[in-house]
Amino acid sequence: MAYADLLSFRAGTMVLTTAIAACLLLFAPSLRAVAQPDCRTIDDFAKATVGELPPDWKLRSDSGKNVYRVAEEPSLKFLHADAKGVGVQAAKEYEWDLGAYPMLVWSWRPLEFPKGGDERESKTNDSALAVYMLVPYSRVRGPKAVKYVWSEKVPVGTRLDSNMGLTQVRVLRSGAPEKKGQWVEERVNVLDDYKKFFDVKETPKPAGIAVLTDSDDTKSSAQGDYANFRVCRQ
């Protein structure tokens, strides 16, 4: 190959290499974006010990130490709740980017509704199942929370509040599932609900989630199961 031809060949190779590199740089951000997971697991209880409360779940009171424990069925571990005359939350710390992952997703099923439970009245405000998103607010008054409830009798879509307005409640389900023991998956846009319920525009930074199966107001008993907590992009 002549010297001039060699220079021309090398120059062409350099141009081609530069063009390829530029294309890679151009598409690199989109490749990284695609690699981001659509969902992040908060807890699927896969590594938890059956018969115990997972160590990273904390009880609001020691009176709830016998309420929550991990149970198992084929191919699934989950958090089982059995409340006998008590009402104690179990919470897990978990911070996430709510703007990027606005959807809160989980599965649940009621096994026993508290006798006479009606979340609209303070004297009967017990639920078989409730899930919270917690947002730091005050060391004295506690966090702000969006609470999702499976009620026995309160109509779906009902809006309630408690804790002097710091807890905003939305009834997601009402009545027994079609089949006893049937799991139901929920997908809620908790960011939209938070902004709407608290009438704010800014995106908060969640501190974690909580569950509550309670029967203290009705002095009865309640049971339910929770599984596969995660946050998703959509």
Task: Give the location of each predicted region.
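N-terminal secretory signal peptides that target proteins for export/translocation
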Residues: M1-M14
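Extracellular beta-strand elements of beta-rich domains used
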Residues: F45, I209, A227-V231
